[in-house]
């Protein structure tokens, strides 16, 4: 609710990408997002890991498994009144894919998209027990502002997780999201889904 409320407060429409399980568990959230005019798309059905972390050129899924997972994802979108043609882009699980996955998606009429690396906005899922991989909300905010100062953020896609582990009590969307939007609006940025 914090993300939706913050975006509404600032008159911003966002893009939300969920797994099939999320669509099944939280249809009321999906309906609210649609009613408020946000883009809602696929993040796969089962959040499969497509390839090993150590070898991006190999695969852990077959084309058939990939296509079945994506079709199941789009079936859940359809149940939420989102038609295939209205959700032509998707963010792969773990934001991790290769050219083969991109080609398979393209053959299904789906375009792979991903966040712009560098801002660390995607690190809002990390928890303190992850040691050096943990990124506090202040760190993420400061990194976004650092990138903005060095190169600007025009065209950047920032990824923030709709929900995070309870072990992360420092939720970016509880304060820093609002602060970031205010700061970027003051600098003349506009936001698009």
Q: Model regions: which residues?
A:
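Active-site beta->alpha N-cap acidic-glycine motif
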Residues: 1-58, 71-88, 180-183
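Terminal accessory/targeting
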Residues: 4-15, 28-31, 119, 130, ...
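Structural recognition of the beta-strand scaffold that forms the well-ordered cores
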Residues: 14-18, 39-42, 86-92, 111-115, ...
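His/Asp/Glu-enriched short active-site or ligand-binding loop at hydrolase and phosphoryl-transfer sites
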Residues: 101-148, 189-193
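Solvent-exposed loop/turn segments at secondary-structure junctions
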Residues: 21-24, 39-40, 45-50, 94-99, ...
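Non-membrane alpha-helical structural segments and their capping/turn regions in soluble enzymes
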Residues: 60-68, 134-138, 170-174, 178
């Amino acid at each position: 609710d914090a993300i939706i409320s913050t975006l509404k407060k600032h008159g911003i429409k966002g893009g939300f990408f969920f797994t099939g399980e999320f669509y099944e568990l939280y249809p009321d959230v999906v309906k609210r997002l649609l009613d408020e005019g946000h883009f809602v798309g696929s993040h796969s059905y089962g959040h499969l890991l497509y390839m090993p972390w150590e070898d991006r050129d190999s695969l852990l899924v077959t084309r058939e498994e990939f296509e079945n997972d994506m079709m199941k994802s789009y079936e859940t979108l359809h149940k939420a009144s989102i038609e295939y043609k209205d959700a032509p882009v998707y963010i792969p699980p773990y934001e991790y894919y290769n050219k083969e996955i991109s080609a398979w998606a393209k053959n299904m009429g789906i375009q792979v998209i991903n966040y712009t690396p560098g801002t660390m906005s995607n690190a809002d899922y990390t928890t303190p027990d992850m040691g050096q991989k943990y990124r506090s909300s202040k760190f993420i905010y400061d990194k976004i502002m650092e990138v903005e100062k060095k190169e600007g953020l025009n065209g950047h896609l920032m990824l923030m997780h709709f929900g995070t582990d309870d072990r992360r009590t420092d939720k970016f969307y509880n304060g820093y999201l609002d602060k970031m939007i205010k700061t970027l609006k003051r600098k003349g940025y506009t936001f698009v889904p």
